Amino acid sequence: MPRVSIVEKSQLFLKAIVEGVPPSLVNSLRRVIISELPVMAIDTVVVVNNTSVMYDEFLAQRLGLIPLTTPLHSLPTYEECATGVADPTECGTRLVLQVTADGDVTVYSGDLTSERPDVVPVYKDIPIVKLVKGQSIVIEAYAKLGIAKDHAKWQAATASYYYYPKVIIKDEKCREICKEICPDLEDPVKCTFNKAWTCKDLCKGGLDVEWEKNKYVFWVESFGNYGVDVALKEAFRILKRKFEAFTEELVKKASSGER
């Protein structure tokens, strides 16, 4: 029976112990979180005026990598946007960056103004470019819903896991030898699998490291486009859709006798 116990949680971070599921399923969830969660990101940039020292292309790249808040509950799904089922105007928004310098000025992500109040830069203090007196930039930027499988600017979160280590201490001296690497050798959250193996090498036979089958320490960190709760719900929705599509195709092939 699958079980999950939360070790640490905040709005943008979650660490949990997962057990009772095969590694293939845990890895599938990890891959979906990294590459298939939909988020808004600037995809097209129209440079109306740029007298700064930075090339238009560099500005466009920086704008594309600024994370934007993404209200999934009020947006069409990525599938609807990608297939043209949804109204294209609902799958994106327009942002404007217009700054004229009266002196030495740093232009920040917070200077971007959006036509949608719910799609704005997550962090207002990301520097874009420096201007001196008399320089100006006027840019129209168009954001749209996308996934990191197409480009890294659409990555919403990162995720990873490691096998739940089982440390067997044969010589109590190992605790002293390893106290800087792993102060608590028997705590799998504080002493990761790799750290435990480092301790094993240092102890030279005084410690064994095994792992528990189908038990892992799993963590997710959101980049701020939405919270980790939303990220996980969306990841499971995507996984469920994939499983349903696979099952449907499998039944279809079996019914028709195809190989």
From Swiss-Prot:
Annotated Gene3D superfamilies: 3.30.70.3110, DNA-directed RNA polymerase, insert domain (2.170.120.12), RNA polymerase, RBP11-like subunit (3.30.1360.10)
Subcellular location: Cytoplasm
Keywords: Cytoplasm, DNA-directed RNA polymerase, Nucleotidyltransferase, Transcription, Transferase
GO molecular function, one term: protein dimerization activity
A biological process term (GO) from this entry: DNA-templated transcription
One Gene Ontology term, aspect cellular component: DNA-directed RNA polymerase complex
The keyword Isomerase is annotated on this UniProt entry: no
Leader sequence residues: none
Catalytic activity reported: RNA(n) + a ribonucleoside 5'-triphosphate = RNA(n+1) + diphosphate
UniProt enzyme class: transferase
Annotated InterPro entries: DNA-dir_RNA_pol_30-40kDasu_CS, DNA-dir_RNA_pol_insert, DNA-dir_RNA_pol_RpoA/D/Rpb3, RBP11-like, RNAP_Rpo3/Rpb3/RPAC1, RNApol_insert_sf, Rpo3/RPB3_RNA_Pol_subunit
Enzyme Commission number(s): 2.7.7.6
Domain of life where this protein originates: Archaea
Family: Belongs to the archaeal Rpo3/eukaryotic RPB3 RNA polymerase subunit family.
Subunit field text: Part of the RNA polymerase complex.
UniProt function note: DNA-dependent RNA polymerase (RNAP) catalyzes the transcription of DNA into RNA using the four ribonucleoside triphosphates as substrates.
Protein name: DNA-directed RNA polymerase subunit Rpo3
Lineage, opening ranks: Archaea, Thermoproteota, Thermoprotei, Thermoproteales, Thermoproteaceae
Gene name for this UniProt entry: rpo3
